[in-house]
Protein backbone atom coordinates (compact mmCIF):
# COMPACT_ATOMS: atom_id res chain seq x y z
CA UNK A 1 0.00 0.00 0.00
CA UNK A 2 2.97 2.25 -0.69
CA UNK A 3 0.89 4.31 -3.12
CA UNK A 4 -1.39 5.36 -0.28
CA UNK A 5 1.58 6.22 1.91
CA UNK A 6 2.77 8.63 -0.82
CA UNK A 7 -0.36 10.78 -0.41
CA UNK A 8 0.33 14.10 1.35
CA UNK A 9 -0.42 17.77 0.81
CA UNK A 10 2.21 19.35 -1.42
CA UNK A 11 3.07 15.99 -2.98
CA UNK A 12 2.29 15.19 -6.59
CA UNK A 13 0.11 12.56 -8.23
CA UNK A 14 3.25 11.10 -9.82
CA UNK A 15 4.55 10.29 -6.32
CA UNK A 16 1.74 7.74 -5.98
CA UNK A 17 2.51 6.09 -9.32
CA UNK A 18 6.25 6.01 -8.66
CA UNK A 19 5.74 4.32 -5.29
CA UNK A 20 3.51 1.63 -6.79
CA UNK A 21 5.61 1.06 -9.91
CA UNK A 22 8.98 0.93 -8.17
CA UNK A 23 7.76 -1.60 -5.61
CA UNK A 24 5.96 -3.78 -8.18
CA UNK A 25 8.99 -3.85 -10.45
CA UNK A 26 11.33 -4.60 -7.52
CA UNK A 27 9.21 -7.74 -7.00
CA UNK A 28 9.50 -8.62 -10.72
CA UNK A 29 5.89 -7.67 -11.42
CA UNK A 30 4.39 -5.12 -13.79
CA UNK A 31 1.77 -2.38 -13.48
CA UNK A 32 -1.15 -2.31 -15.91
CA UNK A 33 -1.25 1.04 -17.71
CA UNK A 34 -4.67 0.68 -19.34
CA UNK A 35 -6.60 1.63 -16.18
CA UNK A 36 -6.17 4.30 -13.56
CA UNK A 37 -7.62 5.66 -10.37
CA UNK A 38 -9.67 8.83 -10.51
CA UNK A 39 -10.85 11.86 -8.65
CA UNK A 40 -14.19 11.73 -6.86
CA UNK A 41 -16.06 15.02 -7.09
CA UNK A 42 -19.10 16.29 -8.93
CA UNK A 43 -18.73 13.15 -11.04
CA UNK A 44 -17.80 9.78 -9.57
CA UNK A 45 -15.05 9.31 -12.18
CA UNK A 46 -13.68 12.85 -12.06
CA UNK A 47 -10.30 14.49 -12.60
CA UNK A 48 -7.50 13.95 -11.88
CA UNK A 49 -6.53 10.58 -13.31
CA UNK A 50 -4.39 8.71 -10.78
CA UNK A 51 -1.78 6.75 -12.73
CA UNK A 52 -0.22 3.76 -10.99
CA UNK A 53 3.13 4.35 -12.66
CA UNK A 54 5.12 7.51 -13.12
CA UNK A 55 7.76 9.80 -11.70
CA UNK A 56 7.95 11.50 -8.35
CA UNK A 57 7.22 15.23 -8.59
CA UNK A 58 5.12 15.00 -11.77
CA UNK A 59 1.40 15.54 -12.17
CA UNK A 60 -1.07 17.64 -10.21
CA UNK A 61 -0.14 18.83 -6.75
CA UNK A 62 -2.13 17.16 -3.97
CA UNK A 63 -4.08 19.57 -1.79
CA UNK A 64 -6.19 19.07 1.34
CA UNK A 65 -9.77 18.22 0.40
CA UNK A 66 -8.92 16.28 -2.75
CA UNK A 67 -10.69 12.91 -2.89
CA UNK A 68 -9.61 10.15 -5.26
CA UNK A 69 -9.17 6.43 -5.74
CA UNK A 70 -5.99 4.40 -5.97
CA UNK A 71 -6.71 1.09 -7.72
CA UNK A 72 -3.67 -0.53 -9.35
CA UNK A 73 -3.60 -3.84 -11.19
CA UNK A 74 -0.33 -5.67 -10.65
CA UNK A 75 0.60 -8.54 -12.98
CA UNK A 76 3.07 -11.36 -12.45
CA UNK A 77 3.96 -11.10 -16.12
CA UNK A 78 3.86 -8.29 -18.63
CA UNK A 79 1.58 -5.25 -18.14
CA UNK A 80 -0.65 -5.87 -21.16
CA UNK A 81 -4.33 -6.76 -20.79
CA UNK A 82 -7.21 -7.49 -23.10
CA UNK A 83 -10.94 -7.02 -22.60
CA UNK A 84 -13.10 -10.08 -23.19
CA UNK A 85 -16.20 -10.10 -25.40
CA UNK A 86 -18.45 -9.19 -22.47
CA UNK A 87 -16.91 -5.71 -22.71
CA UNK A 88 -15.99 -5.69 -19.02
CA UNK A 89 -13.67 -8.51 -17.99
CA UNK A 90 -9.96 -7.71 -18.24
CA UNK A 91 -7.40 -10.52 -18.43
CA UNK A 92 -3.65 -10.52 -18.90
CA UNK A 93 -2.56 -11.11 -22.48
CA UNK A 94 0.19 -13.48 -21.34
CA UNK A 95 -2.24 -15.40 -19.07
CA UNK A 96 -0.29 -14.64 -15.89
CA UNK A 97 -1.95 -13.90 -12.59
CA UNK A 98 -3.01 -10.38 -11.70
CA UNK A 99 -4.22 -8.70 -8.52
CA UNK A 100 -6.11 -5.45 -8.02
CA UNK A 101 -7.22 -3.39 -5.04
CA UNK A 102 -9.09 -0.14 -4.72
CA UNK A 103 -9.25 2.42 -1.95
CA UNK A 104 -10.92 5.80 -1.87
CA UNK A 105 -9.10 8.40 0.18
CA UNK A 106 -8.84 12.08 0.88
CA UNK A 107 -5.88 14.38 1.29
CA UNK A 108 -5.88 15.96 4.77
CA UNK A 109 -3.90 18.90 6.18
CA UNK A 110 -1.19 16.51 7.37
CA UNK A 111 -1.50 13.39 5.22
CA UNK A 112 -4.47 11.29 4.15
CA UNK A 113 -7.58 9.50 5.34
CA UNK A 114 -8.70 6.20 3.82
CA UNK A 115 -12.49 6.05 3.47
CA UNK A 116 -12.74 2.37 2.46
CA UNK A 117 -11.65 0.56 5.61
CA UNK A 118 -13.35 -2.75 6.31
CA UNK A 119 -15.03 -2.88 9.75
CA UNK A 120 -14.10 -6.57 9.84
CA UNK A 121 -10.46 -5.90 9.02
CA UNK A 122 -10.61 -7.41 5.54
CA UNK A 123 -8.60 -4.48 4.17
CA UNK A 124 -5.57 -5.64 6.16
CA UNK A 125 -3.13 -7.61 3.97
CA UNK A 126 -3.35 -11.32 4.63
CA UNK A 127 -6.38 -11.10 6.90
CA UNK A 128 -8.65 -12.97 4.49
CA UNK A 129 -6.43 -16.02 4.89
CA UNK A 130 -6.04 -15.79 8.66
CA UNK A 131 -9.72 -15.69 9.65
CA UNK A 132 -11.96 -18.66 10.09
CA UNK A 133 -14.80 -18.79 7.55
CA UNK A 134 -18.06 -17.24 8.75
CA UNK A 135 -20.66 -19.78 9.81
CA UNK A 136 -23.62 -20.27 7.47
CA UNK A 137 -26.26 -19.70 10.17
Predicted regions and their residues:
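Active-site neighborhoods and metal-handling regions in enzymes and metal-associated proteins
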Residues: 1-137
Amino acid sequence: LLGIEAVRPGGHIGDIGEAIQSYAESERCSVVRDFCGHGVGKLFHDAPNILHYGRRGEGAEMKPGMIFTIEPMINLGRPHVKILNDGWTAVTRDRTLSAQYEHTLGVTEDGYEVFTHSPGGLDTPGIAFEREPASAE
